[in-house]
Amino acid sequence: MNDLISIVVPCYNESEALPKFIEVLDGIIAKMDYADFQVVLVNDGSRDKTLEVMKAIAQTRPYIKYVSFSRNFGKEAGMYAGLTYADGDYVAIMDADLQDPPEFLIDMYEAVTKEGYDCAAARRVTRKGEPPIRSFFARMFYKLMGRMSTTEVVDGARDFRLMNRKFVDALLNCREYNRFSKGMFGWVGFKTKWIAYENVERVAGQTKWNFWSLFKYSIEGIVAFSTTPLVFASFIGLLFCFIAFVAVIFYLLPYLTPSFPSILVSATI
């Protein structure tokens, strides 16, 4: 009996890219005739015709099913929902924009079935085509995470990966509301093989991540997987408490010690 590979594809306004992605994926599935496939498309409250495209695709391919959100909940929610609907012995997460080479799925399957890995993941080693400011802050984020967190977040790590069932079940047991999957992938442990590649630009459409959404996502990751912000906030709180305590003492001393002003004058003279 063949292994079942589930592929989770979160989508937000990907009506242009999705047909091209499915066309490429069909070719990969044809090459991997030694495995069975299930594709879970997740419509994350898209405002274009993504849902209509999903329905049309699912009608012609019985191994494809789709889930549609009532509104845009974000990519993290899309990935989590897709994982809950995935029935496979192995589960992959892929983007529809083809920025992650789907052909890596073949090597990933080899890694998790024959090389003893629990997960095989893609890692981008260049950021060619990205705005310089975005690349700069991305590098800074990974440096900060490396210093502030005990959980490994690999520089350039992508969501594109293939995981065995125990890896997926461990992720599903983490029921955080605000999820940061890049940190959770490392936090659950297990053995991961990294496949490096150079940046590939999206096949169609525009990125849904602007500077501020990425900045917010980075802050959420740092707060979720590092105690440093909490320690810093606690230190600042204690410092201000100490300053306030000293100020109160100096305010009350003249009332508690009537000769205190003359003592200060004598000390000054």
Describe every region a protein language model picked out.
Residues 1, 180-269:
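Hydrophobic helical membrane-anchoring modules
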Residues 1-130:
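Structured catalytic core of nucleotide-sugar glycosyltransferases
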Residues 13, 17, 34, 173-177, ...:
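Alpha-helical structural elements of signaling/regulatory helical domains
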Residues 21-24, 28, 53, 108, ...:
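A ubiquitous structural signal for well-ordered alpha-helices
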Residues 27, 31, 56, 60, ...:
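Conserved amphipathic alpha-helical interaction elements at protein-protein interfaces in regulatory
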Residues 63, 67-71, 75-85, 90, ...:
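Acceptor/aglycone-binding surface of glycosyltransferases and processive sugar-polymer synthases
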